[in-house]
């Protein structure tokens, strides 16, 4: 019901792209809405988020990545008590600088308001290495052994060979499930 009410309140130049959990996706008929659209499945999530004016998230960790854009983040915590009771969080919501709203009217007001919070401390804590060269710096430091000023922690030497497995984006599909099953079968007595 809230989605219908929110859609009616959105102006012609306001579009809300909704990325629902796959289980919930079939419960929403996007054809009923004028300004609420399904999140594009044919585009990379982060590429699409780069063009967004703001991010509305529940308890998903996507806001950690989006924070690097320094654009507005809104936490939609309509089911906070239930979520905290049933699932819990790694970080208290009170430690986050982002506005929290629990109903569609407050969400709409917050979406239309300017960013009015200081996320400097959050960015320093969780995104200290965010810059245009961060991937190069990480590779240079880890692969080439260059000191790029990145904080690292050495693994204790247990005499075993270290193996790095790159498995793509670990999308929720059969390939990822097979990889996870395979990893449980590996003999870890000779290699890390």
Where on the chain are the PLM-derived regions?
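Catalytic donor nucleotide-activated moiety binding site of glycosyltransferases and closely related
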Residues: 3-40
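Short hydrophobic segments within beta-strands
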Residues: 19, 76, 166-167
């Amino acid at each position: 019901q809230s989605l219908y009410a929110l859609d009616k309140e959105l102006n012609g130049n306001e579009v809300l792209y909704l990325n629902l959990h796959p289980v919930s996706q079939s419960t929403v008929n996007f054809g009923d809405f004028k300004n609420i659209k399904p999140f594009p499945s044919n585009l990379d999530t982060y590429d699409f988020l780069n063009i967004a004016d703001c991010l509305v998230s529940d308890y998903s960790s996507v806001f950690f990545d989006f924070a690097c854009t320094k654009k507005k983040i809104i936490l939609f915590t309509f089911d906070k008590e239930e979520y905290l009771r049933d699932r819990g969080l790694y970080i208290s919501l009170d430690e986050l600088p982002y506005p929290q709203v629990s109903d569609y009217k407050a969400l709409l007001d917050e979406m239309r308001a300017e960013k009015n919070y200081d996320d400097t401390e959050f960015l320093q804590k969780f995104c200290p290495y965010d810059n245009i060269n961060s991937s190069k710096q990480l590779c240079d430091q880890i692969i080439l052994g260059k000191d790029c000023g990145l904080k690292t922690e050495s693994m204790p030497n247990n005499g075993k060979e270290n193996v790095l497995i790159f498995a793509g984006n670990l999308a929720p599909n059969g390939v990822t499930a097979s990889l996870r099953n395979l990893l449980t079968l590996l003999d870890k007595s000779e290699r890390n």
